[in-house]
UniProtKB/Swiss-Prot annotation:
This is Ribonuclease P protein component. GO terms for cellular component: ribonuclease P complex. GO terms for molecular function: 3'-tRNA processing endoribonuclease activity; ribonuclease P activity; tRNA binding. Its EC number is 3.1.26.5. Disulfide bonds: none annotated. Gene3D superfamilies: 3.30.230.10. It comes from the Bacteria. SUPFAM superfamilies: Ribosomal protein S5 domain 2-like. GO terms for biological process: tRNA 5'-leader removal. The keyword tRNA processing applies. It catalyses: Endonucleolytic cleavage of RNA, removing 5'-extranucleotides from tRNA precursor. Consists of a catalytic RNA component (M1 or rnpB) and a protein subunit. RNaseP catalyzes the removal of the 5'-leader sequence from pre-tRNA to produce the mature 5'-terminus. It can also cleave other RNA substrates such as 4.5S RNA. The protein component plays an auxiliary but essential role in vivo by binding to the 5'-leader sequence and broadening the substrate specificity of the ribozyme.
Length: 111
């Protein structure tokens, strides 16, 4: 995923949490904020409660891969995906389907 597609700065995360709206399902929480950008930007958050560094990085890699696979269907907004407990045991297909579900609830996913 290119750097221009990532939310990295603390002020951007803070703006998303303060001014954005949130939706959730059992595996993910998504905060989103419309910024009128030419493409989407995403930030990933995986807590230490999910496991050691190897486990957290595996979850982040799978999330990034799923987001790039669905990039043509995503709205051009900033959003943060927070992984909840239990996502570390899911396969890529389950992560993809849960992510699509929560992004549809957030109205970030176009069919």
């Amino acid at each position: 995923m290119k750097k221009s597609y990532r939310v990295k700065k603390e002020k951007d995360f803070k703006a998303l949490f303060d001014a954005g709206h949130s939706v959730a399902n059992r595996k993910f929480v998504v905060y989103c904020l419309d910024r009128n950008l030419p493409h989407f930007r995403v930030g990933l958050s995986v807590s230490k409660h999910l496991g050691n560094a190897v486990t957290r990085n595996r979850v982040k890699r799978r999330l990034r891969h799923a987001l790039m696979d669905m990039s043509s269907q995503l709205e051009h907004q900033d959003f943060v995906v927070i992984a909840r407990k239990g996502v570390e045991d899911l396969s890529y297909q389950d992560i993809y389907s849960n992510l699509v579900h929560v992004l549809k609830i957030a109205k970030l996913y176009k069919d």
